[in-house]
Amino acid sequence: MDRKEQKSIIEGLLFVSGDEGIYPEQIAKVLEIEMNEAINILEEMQQECEGANRGLQIVQYAKVYRFATKKEHASYYQKLIDTPTAASLSQAALETLAIVAYRQPITRTEMEEIRGVKTDKALQTLVSHLLIKEMGRAEGPGRPILYGTTKEFLDTFGLKTLDDLPPLSEENEQMNEADLFFGSLQEISK
């Protein structure tokens, strides 16, 4: 196996080891090479990352090597973190989120009555994005799950409290709440 292939494999090992990183001994064992050789390759790769226009660097802490982003790009990473996750939500998920935000705590059945369609997939998406969570159980047959918004919901849409949601007039309450909330979210995230 040539040096380029070894570096390619080590790059993959660094990636899959994630934040935990990887010891040179582990690399040596996987590649069936001496530990000193693994260290030499890692040091070469560190220099290559430093000299090139690359977004990643290889760092060593307590004998463990791992990938890390470069400090000079930190402002760009922060912009990504600050980008609302709503951009990745479907229209159905946004509509369901609007209903939960204005009517919480609310059951899945109540959401489906308002939307007129099933909400299983949308609920699953919203829970996985940590925008809603189970708030308890409703009284009544089957004790259905009650859903409500989370702190992450407030953070994502730049709200301090639910009171910061645009108010719904009586006339607007008869309209599709999801469309109103979707419009409000677009205003908030600008």
Swiss-Prot record:
Q: Which SUPFAM superfamilies match?
A: Winged helix' DNA-binding domain (SSF46785)
Keywords, A to Z, come to: Cell cycle, Cell division, Chromosome partition, Cytoplasm
Assigned GO CC terms: cytoplasm
InterPro entries recorded: ScpB_csome_segregation, WH-like_DNA-bd_sf, WH_DNA-bd_sf
Q: Does the keyword Cell division apply?
A: yes
UniProt xrefs under Gene3D superfamilies: Winged helix-like DNA-binding domain superfamily/Winged helix DNA-binding domain
The answer to whether keyword Cell cycle applies is yes
Question: Which cell locations does it reside in?
Answer: Cytoplasm
Q: Name one GO biological process term.
A: DNA replication
Q: Which residues form the signal peptide?
A: none
Family the entry assigns? Belongs to the ScpB family.
Q: What NCBIfam families does the record point to?
A: SMC-Scp complex subunit ScpB
Assembly behavior: Homodimer. Homodimerization may be required to stabilize the binding of ScpA to the Smc head domains. Component of a cohesin-like complex composed of ScpA, ScpB and the Smc homodimer, in which ScpA and ScpB bind to the head domain of Smc. The presence of the three proteins is required for the association of the complex with DNA.
Q: Describe the task this protein carries out.
A: Participates in chromosomal partition during cell division. May act via the formation of a condensin-like complex containing Smc and ScpA that pull DNA away from mid-cell into both cell halves.
- Protein name from the UniProt record: Segregation and condensation protein B
Organism equals Bacillus cereus (strain B4264)
